[in-house]
Amino acid sequence: MVAYYHDNTLLHESEILHNMENQLLHTPDGVRDIYNGECKKKLYLQDKLHRTLLKYGYHDIMTPTFEFFNIFGSDVGTTPSKDLYKFFDKEGNTLVLRPDFTPSIARSAAKYYIEDDMPVKLCYLGNTFINSSDYQGRLKESTQCGAELIGDGSISADAEILSMTVESMLESGLKNFQISVGHSQFFYGLTKAAGLSGEQEENLRELIANKNFFGVEEFVDSLSMNDKLRKLFGLLDNFDLQDEQLMEALKLAKGYDEILSSIDTLLKLREYLKAYGIEKYISYELGLISDYTYYTGIIFQGYTYGTGEPIVKLSLIHISEPTRH
Protein backbone atom coordinates (compact mmCIF):
# COMPACT_ATOMS: atom_id res chain seq x y z
CA MET A 1 0.00 0.00 0.00
CA VAL A 2 1.41 3.39 -1.03
CA ALA A 3 1.08 6.30 1.40
CA TYR A 4 1.38 10.05 0.79
CA TYR A 5 1.78 13.01 3.09
CA HIS A 6 -0.63 15.90 2.56
CA ASP A 7 -0.90 18.82 5.01
CA ASN A 8 1.00 16.74 7.61
CA THR A 9 -1.61 13.99 7.31
CA LEU A 10 -0.77 10.46 6.23
CA LEU A 11 -3.09 9.45 3.38
CA HIS A 12 -3.33 5.99 1.93
CA GLU A 13 -3.74 5.55 -1.82
CA SER A 14 -7.32 4.32 -1.35
CA GLU A 15 -8.22 7.52 0.52
CA ILE A 16 -6.74 9.68 -2.23
CA LEU A 17 -8.71 7.82 -4.89
CA HIS A 18 -11.87 8.17 -2.82
CA ASN A 19 -11.39 11.94 -2.50
CA MET A 20 -10.77 12.27 -6.23
CA GLU A 21 -13.91 10.29 -7.03
CA ASN A 22 -15.99 12.50 -4.73
CA GLN A 23 -14.74 15.63 -6.49
CA LEU A 24 -15.50 14.16 -9.89
CA LEU A 25 -19.08 13.42 -8.82
CA HIS A 26 -19.85 16.92 -7.53
CA THR A 27 -20.48 20.19 -9.36
CA PRO A 28 -18.93 23.54 -8.42
CA ASP A 29 -20.95 25.91 -6.23
CA GLY A 30 -23.66 27.74 -8.15
CA VAL A 31 -24.35 25.13 -10.83
CA ARG A 32 -26.31 21.90 -10.72
CA ASP A 33 -27.58 18.95 -12.70
CA ILE A 34 -31.19 18.85 -13.87
CA TYR A 35 -32.44 15.35 -14.61
CA ASN A 36 -35.40 12.96 -14.72
CA GLY A 37 -38.77 14.50 -13.83
CA GLU A 38 -37.43 17.98 -13.18
CA CYS A 39 -35.70 18.07 -16.55
CA LYS A 40 -38.89 16.91 -18.27
CA LYS A 41 -40.92 19.64 -16.54
CA LYS A 42 -38.36 22.30 -17.40
CA LEU A 43 -38.35 21.38 -21.08
CA TYR A 44 -42.16 21.35 -21.11
CA LEU A 45 -42.31 24.81 -19.50
CA GLN A 46 -39.71 26.19 -21.91
CA ASP A 47 -41.75 24.91 -24.84
CA LYS A 48 -44.94 26.53 -23.50
CA LEU A 49 -43.22 29.89 -23.03
CA HIS A 50 -41.54 29.69 -26.43
CA ARG A 51 -44.85 28.99 -28.17
CA THR A 52 -46.38 32.05 -26.51
CA LEU A 53 -43.58 34.29 -27.80
CA LEU A 54 -43.97 32.90 -31.32
CA LYS A 55 -47.72 33.51 -31.11
CA TYR A 56 -47.01 37.23 -30.61
CA GLY A 57 -44.86 37.35 -33.73
CA TYR A 58 -41.38 37.00 -32.24
CA HIS A 59 -38.59 35.28 -34.16
CA ASP A 60 -35.85 33.13 -32.65
CA ILE A 61 -32.30 34.37 -32.38
CA MET A 62 -29.24 32.59 -31.01
CA THR A 63 -26.23 34.60 -29.89
CA PRO A 64 -22.82 33.28 -28.73
CA THR A 65 -22.41 32.03 -25.18
CA PHE A 66 -19.40 34.35 -24.86
CA GLU A 67 -18.65 37.77 -26.36
CA PHE A 68 -15.98 40.46 -26.23
CA PHE A 69 -15.79 42.15 -22.84
CA ASN A 70 -16.89 45.56 -24.14
CA ILE A 71 -20.29 44.15 -25.17
CA PHE A 72 -21.09 43.89 -21.46
CA GLY A 73 -19.09 46.93 -20.35
CA SER A 74 -20.23 49.77 -18.13
CA ASP A 75 -21.84 51.71 -20.98
CA VAL A 76 -24.73 49.27 -21.15
CA GLY A 77 -24.67 48.69 -17.40
CA THR A 78 -25.72 45.07 -17.16
CA THR A 79 -23.61 43.31 -14.54
CA PRO A 80 -20.67 44.65 -12.50
CA SER A 81 -17.31 43.60 -13.90
CA LYS A 82 -16.46 41.70 -10.71
CA ASP A 83 -19.49 39.44 -11.29
CA LEU A 84 -18.57 38.52 -14.86
CA TYR A 85 -16.91 35.27 -15.87
CA LYS A 86 -13.88 36.59 -17.80
CA PHE A 87 -11.18 34.71 -19.69
CA PHE A 88 -8.72 35.26 -22.54
CA ASP A 89 -8.41 33.75 -26.00
CA LYS A 90 -5.04 32.96 -27.63
CA GLU A 91 -4.92 36.43 -29.20
CA GLY A 92 -5.20 38.11 -25.80
CA ASN A 93 -8.78 39.35 -26.18
CA THR A 94 -10.84 39.51 -22.99
CA LEU A 95 -13.97 37.41 -23.39
CA VAL A 96 -17.03 37.13 -21.14
CA LEU A 97 -19.67 34.46 -20.61
CA ARG A 98 -22.95 36.30 -21.19
CA PRO A 99 -24.63 37.51 -17.98
CA ASP A 100 -27.61 38.84 -19.95
CA PHE A 101 -28.99 38.47 -23.47
CA THR A 102 -29.98 42.06 -24.26
CA PRO A 103 -26.52 43.51 -25.13
CA SER A 104 -25.79 40.56 -27.43
CA ILE A 105 -29.11 40.96 -29.22
CA ALA A 106 -28.57 44.72 -29.51
CA ARG A 107 -25.21 44.00 -31.15
CA SER A 108 -26.82 41.53 -33.54
CA ALA A 109 -29.61 43.96 -34.45
CA ALA A 110 -27.07 46.68 -35.23
CA LYS A 111 -25.18 44.26 -37.48
CA TYR A 112 -27.98 42.51 -39.34
CA TYR A 113 -30.94 44.91 -39.45
CA ILE A 114 -31.43 48.35 -40.98
CA GLU A 115 -33.89 51.07 -40.04
CA ASP A 116 -36.34 49.93 -42.73
CA ASP A 117 -36.58 46.55 -40.97
CA MET A 118 -37.91 48.12 -37.78
CA PRO A 119 -39.66 47.15 -35.62
CA VAL A 120 -37.90 43.84 -35.03
CA LYS A 121 -39.24 41.20 -32.65
CA LEU A 122 -36.64 38.72 -31.40
CA CYS A 123 -36.93 36.01 -28.76
CA TYR A 124 -34.33 33.84 -27.09
CA LEU A 125 -33.85 30.89 -24.79
CA GLY A 126 -30.55 29.98 -23.20
CA ASN A 127 -28.32 30.08 -20.16
CA THR A 128 -26.69 33.10 -18.54
CA PHE A 129 -23.72 33.18 -16.17
CA ILE A 130 -23.16 35.52 -13.21
CA ASN A 131 -20.29 34.93 -10.78
CA SER A 132 -22.20 35.92 -7.64
CA SER A 133 -20.87 35.27 -4.16
CA ASP A 134 -21.35 31.76 -2.77
CA TYR A 135 -22.82 33.37 0.34
CA GLN A 136 -25.76 34.74 -1.66
CA GLY A 137 -27.00 31.23 -2.30
CA ARG A 138 -27.92 31.99 -5.91
CA LEU A 139 -27.31 29.85 -8.95
CA LYS A 140 -24.47 31.15 -11.10
CA GLU A 141 -25.89 29.54 -14.22
CA SER A 142 -29.56 30.09 -14.97
CA THR A 143 -31.90 29.74 -17.93
CA GLN A 144 -33.57 32.79 -19.42
CA CYS A 145 -36.46 32.91 -21.85
CA GLY A 146 -37.27 36.37 -23.12
CA ALA A 147 -38.13 38.76 -25.90
CA GLU A 148 -36.73 41.99 -27.31
CA LEU A 149 -38.83 44.49 -29.25
CA ILE A 150 -36.53 46.85 -31.14
CA GLY A 151 -37.65 50.01 -32.90
CA ASP A 152 -41.14 50.52 -31.47
CA GLY A 153 -41.38 52.96 -28.58
CA SER A 154 -45.17 53.22 -28.61
CA ILE A 155 -47.34 52.72 -25.56
CA SER A 156 -49.33 50.11 -27.49
CA ALA A 157 -46.12 48.09 -27.89
CA ASP A 158 -45.50 48.33 -24.14
CA ALA A 159 -49.03 47.10 -23.49
CA GLU A 160 -48.64 44.18 -25.89
CA ILE A 161 -45.48 43.01 -24.12
CA LEU A 162 -47.24 43.18 -20.77
CA SER A 163 -50.15 41.21 -22.21
CA MET A 164 -47.68 38.64 -23.53
CA THR A 165 -46.05 38.46 -20.10
CA VAL A 166 -49.37 37.82 -18.37
CA GLU A 167 -50.29 35.15 -20.93
CA SER A 168 -46.88 33.50 -20.49
CA MET A 169 -47.35 33.30 -16.73
CA LEU A 170 -50.84 31.86 -17.13
CA GLU A 171 -49.55 29.34 -19.69
CA SER A 172 -46.89 28.26 -17.20
CA GLY A 173 -49.67 27.25 -14.80
CA LEU A 174 -49.53 30.21 -12.43
CA LYS A 175 -52.82 31.61 -11.15
CA ASN A 176 -51.80 33.92 -8.32
CA PHE A 177 -49.24 36.46 -9.45
CA GLN A 178 -48.81 40.20 -9.71
CA ILE A 179 -46.87 42.41 -12.09
CA SER A 180 -45.52 45.69 -10.72
CA VAL A 181 -45.17 48.37 -13.39
CA GLY A 182 -43.08 51.53 -13.18
CA HIS A 183 -41.11 53.87 -15.40
CA SER A 184 -37.34 54.36 -15.32
CA GLN A 185 -37.58 58.09 -16.05
CA PHE A 186 -39.50 58.79 -12.84
CA PHE A 187 -36.40 58.09 -10.76
CA TYR A 188 -34.07 59.99 -13.10
CA GLY A 189 -36.51 62.89 -13.24
CA LEU A 190 -36.57 63.08 -9.44
CA THR A 191 -32.79 63.10 -9.13
CA LYS A 192 -32.50 65.78 -11.82
CA ALA A 193 -35.20 67.98 -10.27
CA ALA A 194 -33.59 67.66 -6.83
CA GLY A 195 -30.15 68.48 -8.26
CA LEU A 196 -28.53 65.35 -6.83
CA SER A 197 -24.88 64.62 -7.41
CA GLY A 198 -23.80 61.32 -8.94
CA GLU A 199 -22.88 59.99 -5.52
CA GLN A 200 -26.20 61.06 -4.00
CA GLU A 201 -28.07 59.44 -6.88
CA GLU A 202 -26.28 56.14 -6.30
CA ASN A 203 -26.97 56.32 -2.56
CA LEU A 204 -30.67 56.89 -3.21
CA ARG A 205 -30.76 54.09 -5.78
CA GLU A 206 -29.23 51.67 -3.28
CA LEU A 207 -31.74 52.65 -0.58
CA ILE A 208 -34.66 52.08 -2.96
CA ALA A 209 -33.25 48.81 -4.29
CA ASN A 210 -32.96 47.53 -0.71
CA LYS A 211 -36.51 48.74 0.08
CA ASN A 212 -35.05 50.86 2.88
CA PHE A 213 -37.73 53.53 2.77
CA PHE A 214 -36.95 54.82 6.25
CA GLY A 215 -33.52 55.56 4.84
CA VAL A 216 -35.12 57.20 1.79
CA GLU A 217 -37.20 59.42 4.08
CA GLU A 218 -34.13 60.48 6.04
CA PHE A 219 -32.27 61.11 2.79
CA VAL A 220 -35.06 63.31 1.42
CA ASP A 221 -35.38 65.19 4.72
CA SER A 222 -31.73 66.17 4.43
CA LEU A 223 -32.37 67.88 1.08
CA SER A 224 -33.72 71.33 0.36
CA MET A 225 -36.72 71.15 -2.01
CA ASN A 226 -40.26 72.47 -2.47
CA ASP A 227 -43.37 70.72 -1.18
CA LYS A 228 -44.43 69.39 -4.61
CA LEU A 229 -41.13 67.63 -5.16
CA ARG A 230 -41.11 66.32 -1.59
CA LYS A 231 -44.56 64.78 -2.15
CA LEU A 232 -43.34 63.15 -5.36
CA PHE A 233 -40.42 61.61 -3.46
CA GLY A 234 -43.00 60.36 -0.97
CA LEU A 235 -44.57 58.16 -3.66
CA LEU A 236 -41.47 55.96 -3.89
CA ASP A 237 -42.63 53.65 -1.09
CA ASN A 238 -46.12 52.98 -2.48
CA PHE A 239 -46.27 49.52 -4.06
CA ASP A 240 -49.81 49.79 -5.44
CA LEU A 241 -50.72 53.28 -6.58
CA GLN A 242 -54.41 53.75 -7.31
CA ASP A 243 -55.86 55.79 -10.17
CA GLU A 244 -56.51 58.86 -8.05
CA GLN A 245 -52.95 58.79 -6.68
CA LEU A 246 -51.51 58.67 -10.20
CA MET A 247 -53.73 61.60 -11.21
CA GLU A 248 -52.56 63.58 -8.18
CA ALA A 249 -48.94 62.75 -9.03
CA LEU A 250 -49.54 64.06 -12.56
CA LYS A 251 -50.63 67.42 -11.12
CA LEU A 252 -47.61 67.58 -8.83
CA ALA A 253 -45.26 66.79 -11.72
CA LYS A 254 -46.12 69.87 -13.77
CA GLY A 255 -42.89 71.73 -14.41
CA TYR A 256 -40.76 68.58 -14.23
CA ASP A 257 -40.73 67.21 -17.77
CA GLU A 258 -39.21 63.76 -17.16
CA ILE A 259 -41.43 63.07 -14.16
CA LEU A 260 -44.53 64.36 -15.95
CA SER A 261 -43.84 62.27 -19.04
CA SER A 262 -43.28 59.07 -17.05
CA ILE A 263 -46.54 59.40 -15.11
CA ASP A 264 -48.49 60.38 -18.22
CA THR A 265 -47.14 57.28 -19.98
CA LEU A 266 -48.26 55.05 -17.11
CA LEU A 267 -51.76 56.56 -17.18
CA LYS A 268 -52.06 55.96 -20.92
CA LEU A 269 -50.65 52.46 -20.54
CA ARG A 270 -53.28 51.74 -17.90
CA GLU A 271 -56.06 52.30 -20.47
CA TYR A 272 -54.46 49.87 -22.92
CA LEU A 273 -54.12 47.22 -20.21
CA LYS A 274 -57.78 47.60 -19.33
CA ALA A 275 -58.61 46.95 -22.99
CA TYR A 276 -56.50 43.77 -22.85
CA GLY A 277 -58.45 42.72 -19.75
CA ILE A 278 -55.35 42.12 -17.63
CA GLU A 279 -55.60 45.02 -15.17
CA LYS A 280 -56.26 42.68 -12.23
CA TYR A 281 -52.70 41.38 -12.57
CA ILE A 282 -51.13 44.86 -12.66
CA SER A 283 -50.04 47.24 -9.90
CA TYR A 284 -48.21 50.54 -10.32
CA GLU A 285 -45.01 51.26 -8.40
CA LEU A 286 -43.09 54.48 -9.00
CA GLY A 287 -40.28 53.25 -6.76
CA LEU A 288 -39.46 50.46 -9.20
CA ILE A 289 -35.96 50.94 -10.60
CA SER A 290 -33.84 48.97 -13.03
CA ASP A 291 -30.35 47.63 -12.42
CA TYR A 292 -29.62 48.20 -16.09
CA THR A 293 -28.86 51.76 -17.16
CA TYR A 294 -29.71 51.11 -20.81
CA TYR A 295 -33.40 50.62 -19.94
CA THR A 296 -35.18 53.88 -20.69
CA GLY A 297 -38.89 53.24 -20.50
CA ILE A 298 -41.44 51.04 -18.81
CA ILE A 299 -40.11 48.67 -16.13
CA PHE A 300 -42.01 45.70 -14.76
CA GLN A 301 -41.41 42.76 -12.47
CA GLY A 302 -43.57 39.70 -11.85
CA TYR A 303 -44.05 38.07 -8.46
CA THR A 304 -45.79 34.99 -7.13
CA TYR A 305 -46.00 33.13 -3.83
CA GLY A 306 -43.10 31.07 -2.54
CA THR A 307 -40.28 32.94 -4.27
CA GLY A 308 -37.92 35.47 -2.79
CA GLU A 309 -37.00 36.95 -6.16
CA PRO A 310 -39.07 38.26 -9.08
CA ILE A 311 -39.87 35.48 -11.54
CA VAL A 312 -40.09 38.05 -14.35
CA LYS A 313 -37.67 40.96 -14.60
CA LEU A 314 -38.24 42.88 -17.78
CA SER A 315 -37.69 46.36 -19.06
CA LEU A 316 -38.36 47.91 -22.42
CA ILE A 317 -35.73 49.47 -24.63
CA HIS A 318 -36.96 52.12 -27.02
CA ILE A 319 -34.55 52.20 -29.96
CA SER A 320 -35.39 54.24 -33.03
CA GLU A 321 -32.29 53.22 -35.00
CA PRO A 322 -30.49 49.87 -34.95
CA THR A 323 -27.14 51.52 -34.30
CA ARG A 324 -28.25 53.13 -31.04
CA HIS A 325 -27.68 50.48 -28.35
What is the meaning of each model-derived region?
Residues 83-89, 196-216, 304:
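Acidic, His- and aromatic-enriched active-site or binding-groove loops in soluble protein domains
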